[in-house]
Amino acid sequence: MFSIIFIALLILLITTIVMFLASILSKKALIDREKSSPFECGFDPKSSSRLPFSLRFFLITIIFLIFDVEIALILPMIIIMKYSNIMIWTITSIIFILILLIGLYHEWNQGMLNWSN
């Protein structure tokens, strides 16, 4: 038990030292606006290099990722059904699906699924 804690603390210490050294060694000495710009030659740009970003696409992407992870969590529940107690499995599944439906209702109620706004 003591050796496991010692190894964990040693790993934590080593990673902390490596991260500290990396942050010190990676800092730039002189910050110049032209050199920090996305252009390679260092001249002043005529227009902004930032492209407009649609917040709707971002929200739809986040919602898709959330529901994609939920599907990845539901699929193993089907396989586990025959190995577990049916009552506990049913209660767990109902609670999980209820949480999903509450989240979907909240997104719908907030207008995140309405593309026209």
Swiss-Prot record:
MF term (GO), any: NADH dehydrogenase (ubiquinone) activity
Transmembrane segments: 4-24, 60-80, 86-106
GO CC, alphabetical: mitochondrial inner membrane; respiratory chain complex I
Location(s) in or outside the cell: Mitochondrion membrane
Catalytic activity line of the entry: a ubiquinone + NADH + 5 H(+)(in) = a ubiquinol + NAD(+) + 4 H(+)(out)
Highest taxon above the source species: Eukaryota
Membrane topology: Multi-pass membrane protein
Gene3D superfamilies: NADH:ubiquinone/plastoquinone oxidoreductase, chain 3 (1.20.58.1610)
UniProt EC number: 7.1.1.2
Record InterPro entries: NADH_UbQ/plastoQ_OxRdtase_su3, NDAH_ubi_oxred_su3_sf
Keywords: Electron transport, Membrane, Mitochondrion, NAD, Respiratory chain, Translocase, Transmembrane, Transmembrane helix, Transport, Ubiquinone
GO BP terms: mitochondrial electron transport, NADH to ubiquinone
Enzyme kind, highest EC tier: translocase
Annotated family: Belongs to the complex I subunit 3 family.
Its biological purpose: Core subunit of the mitochondrial membrane respiratory chain NADH dehydrogenase (Complex I) that is believed to belong to the minimal assembly required for catalysis. Complex I functions in the transfer of electrons from NADH to the respiratory chain. The immediate electron acceptor for the enzyme is believed to be ubiquinone.
Full protein name: NADH-ubiquinone oxidoreductase chain 3
